[in-house]
Amino acid sequence: MKPVTTDLCDAHEDRLADGTLRVMAPVFRAFGKQGAFAGPAATLKVFEDNSLVRTALEAPGQGRVLVIDGGGSLRCALVGGNLGLLAEKNGWVGIVVNGCIRDTAELDVCDIGIRALAVHPQKSQKRNVGESDVAVQMPGAVVRPGNWIYVDADGVLVSDERLGN
């Protein structure tokens, strides 16, 4: 699916008003080959530790979007080229990171979509600390497991259920 976030917002003003459709803050940079992507969310809450990111991406993605609340840290990367390839191989359609990524040249040839706050060359810690399948606070919106994520050049939307145009 190639979402058009502007059309979704226009068609679902009632959901925007009642909070069942939310718009993330416009703070993300785009990476990966897919400029637009959509799917149900899988969620992680981590801080400067990407162990659970690898674990999540090793599982079949089944067309899902991995939403990572990295606490907005700008001190290290949570996703790099190896994890981008793993996501592509295992059927994830996208990754949204409240934090940093690295290996942008490698990520930009992965056939997935990625949104992140920034780029940082340093890798993260590996302590197996964090939570999966929990509600996460992303910039401007809470995301719960199973919410639908819609991403294109105009923004990132979070819906409590799958939307049609």
From Swiss-Prot:
The keyword Metal-binding applies. It catalyses: 4-hydroxy-4-methyl-2-oxoglutarate = 2 pyruvate; oxaloacetate + H(+) = pyruvate + CO2. A divalent metal cation binds at residue 103. Substrate binds at residues 80-83, 102. Pfam families: RraA-like (PF03737). GO terms for molecular function: 4-hydroxy-4-methyl-2-oxoglutarate aldolase activity; metal ion binding; oxaloacetate decarboxylase activity; ribonuclease inhibitor activity. Keywords: Lyase, Metal-binding. The keyword Transit peptide does not apply. GO terms for biological process: regulation of RNA metabolic process. Its EC number is 4.1.3.17, 4.1.1.112. Divalent metal cation. InterPro entries: RraA, RraA/RraA-like, RraA/RraA-like_sf. Signal peptide: none annotated. Its cofactor is a divalent metal cation. NCBIfam families: NOT-MenG (TIGR01935), PRK09372.1 (NF006875). Catalyzes the aldol cleavage of 4-hydroxy-4-methyl-2-oxoglutarate (HMG) into 2 molecules of pyruvate. Also contains a secondary oxaloacetate (OAA) decarboxylase activity due to the common pyruvate enolate transition state formed following C-C bond cleavage in the retro-aldol and decarboxylation reactions. Homotrimer. Belongs to the class II aldolase/RraA-like family. This is Putative 4-hydroxy-4-methyl-2-oxoglutarate aldolase. It comes from Cupriavidus necator (strain ATCC 17699 / DSM 428 / KCTC 22496 / NCIMB 10442 / H16 / Stanier 337).
